[in-house]
């Protein structure tokens, strides 16, 4: 690969200040840029903003390291840490663009995050998921999808038969995420010929 790999950071669109997820997302942004990756996200608040803030705090950050794929038609809706805002006008359909990055890291998240996880799984992307220490939700309500899917397969299809142990890789720290990316990303670099073909 003759470019910086682009890693999607997905998750909650709003977060409580100093929550476990906000702290992790910010640390993740710093660690990714420091390790030589670019970040792509949905460009708005919550996990997206925390990851961007962390990216800007990296000692090797440079302009262009944080890409935001916005659901609306105006780039001005982007959070202040987005270097390259892409205003798609696609609403939630923009989730496919985010998911078709080189790898995807989920931090909590609701149904929008679940759609991105599903797209990434179908597209055979490397997927990492934060094991949220105290996940939200109840027996009747799914929440914090990263905690639910961590260390599991999203369905019963053998999407990458050449990769032993293929699954959503659970992580507890930003360092875990960077280490798994370094080890696993080369295995997932190929892409399906077209969407839906398995």
Describe each model-derived feature in a short phrase:
Residues 42, 166, 192-194:
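Flexible, glycine/charged-enriched surface loops at secondary-structure junctions
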Residues 141-154, 167-168, 173:
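Structured adenosyl-cofactor binding patch, chiefly the S-adenosyl-L-methionine
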Residues 85-89, 164-180:
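Short acidic-hydrophobic, aromatic-tinged amphipathic segments that line or gate anion-handling sites
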Residues 2-19, 29-30, 34-35:
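Generic N-terminal amphipathic, Lys/Arg-enriched alpha-helix
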Residues 179-198:
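C-terminal amphipathic helix plus adjacent low-complexity
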Residues 77-79, 154-164:
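Short, conserved catalytic or adaptor-binding loops enriched in Gly and charged residues
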Residues 23-26, 30-33, 41, 45-119, ...:
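Acidic/glycine-enriched connector segments
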